[in-house]
């Protein structure tokens, strides 16, 4: 059995954006106050959690929301963790210009 593995990502998103964006991974949007979701992956799971941080002000004009989003993998191999992380990153990727 694989020991739990946790990774953290500093992200710029609100709780509402997190709840909406995670929907393709969970099969539906999270409820209004939910800050984490457990996602079944093969014979294991991933707990994805949102932890808000103070926003940062850019150029005195714009406040950017910040949060630590953690992924805690239970019972997954390195290959499975890598595949899920790639899917997570793609799901949360935003267009730039």
Question: What spans do the regions from the language model cover?
Answer:
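Short, conserved charged micro-motifs
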Residues: 15-20, 77-83
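A short, structured beta-strand/loop element
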Residues: 43-61
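Short secondary-structure junctions
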Residues: 25-37
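A common structural junction motif
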Residues: 26-29, 88-96
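Structured alpha/beta or helical-core interaction and ligand-binding surfaces enriched in interleaved
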Residues: 1-5, 33-35, 52
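Terminal, regulation- and interaction-focused segments at domain boundaries
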Residues: 1-25
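Beta-strand secondary-structure signal
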Residues: 40, 47, 68-70
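Intrinsically disordered, low-complexity regulatory segments enriched in Ser/Thr/Pro
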Residues: 55-76
